[in-house]
């Protein structure tokens, strides 16, 4: 269908607004989204004119263009629902936009989505895309002056060995994660002392940052992603500053070093570089690996229990995988995986959203560190909930600290770069399964960027003072 025939049944106002549409795909979906918006804006005097002014003069100041907030915050387009500001930012600015986590409201916006007011601003130029943070290089000393007697390893590692429970502790989202407003009072989780260097929110306070729904893509959109669940909690929007870094690219990943660092001869800077595949995912049944590793090149990945004959590179379909040793428990569990989990990587952060009707269970040391939980804690994510499971910036800070404490301290961080996740069945102190290898269906996620960064840092550090082994 060409553009002329497509527009033959559209109103002049919709035609005009579609003239500013970005991207070439899903013309019909964009038309329906704009048509739904026009019907709402016609009820407000001057709203259409203000939107056209914003779209035609993107560099000029413009007023909020609002529509009423629905009960669940979502807008239905083509029988599916999405968050309104995401839908129209996708239509008019960023066709590849996947989630509301990628957007921040500008200071000039009076009705940002996150403010929970009765009206929502959908002016695409009142939002800015979240940029991946530029991670500072790790400075590795060229000459080792490390004194083993002054090692922090006893504090860094021994607590893990001394307080390691017979099986992992458990936490449930959102019950175990206090949902506090921004600038809330500090909290101390009821879990054993973290074995990592003091976490940012262990005794210093934390704000829950897990909205009920991270995704706002849907099968009616250009991305063929699932329907957006309603957001149950979102922190207030933080004002955007005008000096944010531009979207991450390979040039920004190795930024120009300050003169005082570049002139130093006693350190070797090791910069973070974004890999071609941000993660690999391996599927297991009990303690048996099944199938080949899935390499994630897209920032948005679905891991589900279905089959996909089209071999979509954004989907890892576990239903395709066969295993001659599969028992009835595994078969039954696989039937309940359903829509599975949505993993996505944005702004240097990894999120997991449970799309399955059954809960998923996640063991992420980075997430546990952030919340002050014991490193091996297993977090339950119920259906239609999401959780941030890795933060590049916090990992960078830990790595920079650990370099000064020796090879072993840096090597210990490799455990943080692997995330384990089980479907339907959990494990840990509250379950009869003690280990993830006892769960019927689970995946292991390897984060390539952090792992490769660690490898480069360890290479610069040379050999360890104590041999690294499987029991070290």
Swiss-Prot record:
For bias type Polar residues, the affected ranges are 169-182
Q: What is this protein called?
A: Mothers against decapentaplegic homolog 1
Segments forming a coiled coil: none
Q: Tell me which InterPro entries the record gives.
A: Dwarfin (IPR013790), MAD_homology1_Dwarfin-type (IPR003619), MAD_homology_MH1 (IPR013019), SMAD-like_dom_sf (IPR017855), SMAD_dom_Dwarfin-type (IPR001132), SMAD_FHA_dom_sf (IPR008984), SMAD_MH1_sf (IPR036578)
An example GO biological process term is:
dorsal/ventral pattern formation
Q: Which domain of life, per UniProt?
A: Eukaryota
The residue ranges of the MH1 domain are: 12-136
To which protein family does this belong? Answer: Belongs to the dwarfin/SMAD family.
The record's Pfam families line, in alphabetical order, gives: MH1 (PF03165), MH2 (PF03166)
Pro residues composition bias: residue spans:
227-238
Here the segments flagged for biased composition (Low complexity) are 188-226
An example of a GO molecular function for this protein is: DNA-binding transcription factor activity
């Amino acid at each position: 269908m060409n553009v002329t025939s497509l527009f033959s049944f559209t109103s002049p106002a919709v035609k005009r607004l579609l003239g500013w549409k970005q991207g070439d795909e899903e013309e019909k979906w964009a038309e329906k989204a704009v048509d739904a918006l026009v019907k709402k804006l016609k009820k407000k005097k001057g709203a259409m004119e203000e939107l056209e002014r914003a779209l035609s003069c993107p560099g000029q100041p413009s007023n909020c263009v609002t529509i009423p907030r629905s009960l669940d915050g979502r807008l239905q387009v083509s029988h599916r629902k999405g968050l309104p500001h995401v839908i129209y930012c996708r239509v008019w600015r960023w066709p590849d936009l996947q989630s509301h986590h990628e957007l921040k409201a500008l200071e000039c916006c009076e009705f940002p989505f996150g403010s929970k007011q009765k009206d929502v601003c959908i002016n695409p130029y009142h939002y800015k895309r979240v940029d991946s943070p530029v991670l500072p290089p790790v400075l590795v000393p060229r000459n080792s002056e490390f004194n083993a007697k002054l090692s922090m390893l006893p504090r860094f590692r021994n607590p893990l060995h001394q307080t390691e429970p017979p099986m992992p502790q458990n936490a449930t989202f959102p019950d175990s994660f206090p949902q506090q407003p921004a600038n809330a009072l500090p909290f101390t989780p009821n879990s054993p002392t973290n074995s990592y260097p003091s976490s940012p929110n262990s005794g210093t306070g934390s704000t829950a940052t897990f909205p009920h729904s991270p995704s706002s893509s849907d099968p009616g959109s250009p991305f063929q992603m699932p329907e957006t669940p309603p957001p149950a909690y979102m922190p207030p929007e933080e004002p955007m500053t005008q000096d944010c870094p531009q979207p991450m690219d390979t040039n920004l990943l190795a930024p120009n070093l300050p003169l005082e660092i570049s002139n130093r001869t006693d350190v070797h800077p090791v910069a973070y570089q974004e890999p071609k595949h941000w993660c690999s995912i391996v599927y297991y049944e009990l303690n048996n690996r099944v199938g080949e590793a899935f390499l994630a090149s897209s920032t948005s990945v679905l891991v589900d229990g279905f089959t996909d004959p089209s071999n979509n590179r954004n989907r890892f379909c576990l239903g395709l995988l066969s295993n001659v040793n599969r028992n009835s428990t595994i078969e039954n569990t696989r039937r309940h995986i359903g829509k599975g989990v949505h993993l996505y990587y944005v702004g240097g952060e990894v999120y997991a959203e449970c799309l399955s009707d059954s809960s998923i269970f996640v063991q992420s040391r980075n997430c546990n560190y952030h919340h002050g939980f014991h490193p091996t804690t297993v977090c339950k994510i119920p259906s239609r909930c999401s959780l941030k499971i890795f933060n590049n910036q916090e990992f960078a800070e830990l790595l920079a600290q650990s370099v000064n404490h020796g090879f072993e301290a840096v090597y210990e961080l490799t455990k943080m770069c692997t995330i384990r996740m089980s479907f339907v069945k959990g494990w840990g102190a509250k379950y009869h399964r003690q280990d993830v290898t006892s769960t019927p269906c689970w995946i292991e996620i390897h984060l390539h960027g952090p792992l490769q960064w660690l490898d480069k840092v360890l290479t610069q550090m040379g050999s360890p003072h104590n041999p690294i082994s499987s029991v070290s």
